[in-house]
């Protein structure tokens, strides 16, 4: 998985993405507010069952990895959650994706179990799942 999948989504206009001219794409993320069936069938237990955003396709250009770009993208995601008064960010990863697991844990995500995908071409594939609770400033409520 990488930038080609995201560009494909932009071309299809999936996830509400719009194509624009860029000099260079440094990184991408897809934030999905949709409730996803595999996330409701977790083998484990989420921290919360409240509204959540799912992170898909977090990717950074390989030429600039380890420069904090992914963390900045994640910080943007958290700000979007705060704007929308959403307390939880959830995501999944391949079991053997050690760099992603390390990145998530370094950025405050915790492991909560496994799910099995329900969409082609990955039906039945296991993913490990993580969740992070966002601290929303009290004055927003």
Q: Across the structure, where does each feature detected by a protein language model lie?
A:
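Conserved acyl-donor/pantetheine-binding loop and adjacent beta-alpha core of acyl/acetyltransferases
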Residues: 24, 28-57, 65, 118
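Conserved short alpha-helix immediately C-terminal to the canonical SAM/SAH-binding motif I
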Residues: 73, 97-100
């Amino acid at each position: 998985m990488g930038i080609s999948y995201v560009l494909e989504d932009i071309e299809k206009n999936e996830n509400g993405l719009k194509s624009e001219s860029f000099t260079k794409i440094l990184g991408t993320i897809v934030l999905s507010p949709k409730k996803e069936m595999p996330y409701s069938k977790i083998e484990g237990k989420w921290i919360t069952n409240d509204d959540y955003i799912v992170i898909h396709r977090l990717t950074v250009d390989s030429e600039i990895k380890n420069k904090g770009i992914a963390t900045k993208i994640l910080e943007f995601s958290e700000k979007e959650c705060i704007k929308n008064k959403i307390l939880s960010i959830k995501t999944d990863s391949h079991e053997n994706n050690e760099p992603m697991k390390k990145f998530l844990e370094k950025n405050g995500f915790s492991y909560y179990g496994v799910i099995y995908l329900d969409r082609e071409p990955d039906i039945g594939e296991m993913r490990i799942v993580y969740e992070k609770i966002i601290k929303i400033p009290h004055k927003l409520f």
